[in-house]
Amino acid sequence: MGACFDLAGRTAVVVGGTTGIGRALALGLADAGADVVATGRRKAMVDEVAALIESKGRRTARIATDVGDTASLNALRDECVSSLGAVDIVVAAAGITKRVASVEMTDLEWDQIIETNLTGMMRTYRAFAPGMIARGQGRLIGIGSLASFVGLMEVAAYTASKSAVAGLTRALAIEWAPHGITVNAIAPGVFETDLNREILKGPRGQEFLMRTPMRRFGRTEELVGAAVYLASDAASFVTGQLLVVDGGLLASAVNV
């Protein structure tokens, strides 16, 4: 059974892979045997994660990328293929949020969140899908959220973007299934990262904590199993799904 989850001989690209959830997934895929390129906008952080991947005995490439730029993503694809060969697994993990009352949100704030969380994901997939279609196989994995299922207070743009991630995942899954490509997403509950650590220390964090049946926040490494599963042969017939990893929060059916 262990062989079903072995990623040896495969190449993964994690866009948004230098911080938070993306970083944990990049390192986890490397632990599972894959060669991994973890990319982001800041070259110093790209180099830092690349060194950790290399320390695990895996191959990598050090490439800074901007999900807001199609040319940058196409260049990432070309350099990955040139350095490591065909890309088997792509994780679209770039994401941002901002808590603000909807009537006070600026057009720029709205556009930045939709651009990164939704359009950036589509750009990422669009860069790598043609190669996967040509080979007749591939794994695309996005990052959803509890906001893919329910509304969250004062994060309207984030909620809209993550709801759209769910729709995009399903649409691309049925479009690309005939080409041997699976398209899925992981929907984390409340996980402590640099992005939300200060918020979780306050009253809002305590509310989430009390509404999570396991009575704790998730650790980013607890998302690795979901990513390895979706990237592996074990999930060869799984597509169009959002895999929830949330300590039971969504199942508790309370207003979050």
Regions found by a protein language model. Name each.
Residues 2-3, 150, 228, 239-256:
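Short C-terminal tail/terminal secondary-structure segment
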Residues 18-20, 42:
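Conserved glycine-rich cofactor-binding loop
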Residues 101-102, 106-114, 208:
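Substrate-binding pocket helix/loop in short-chain dehydrogenase/reductase
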Residues 125, 161, 169:
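Active-site helix of classical SDR
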Residues 130, 174-175, 236:
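Alpha-helical segment proximal to the catalytic Tyr-Lys
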Residues 145:
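Residue(s) in the substrate-gating loop at a strand-loop-helix junction
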Residues 177, 182, 238-240:
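Short, small/polar-rich loop/turn modules that mediate ligand/substrate recognition or access, typified
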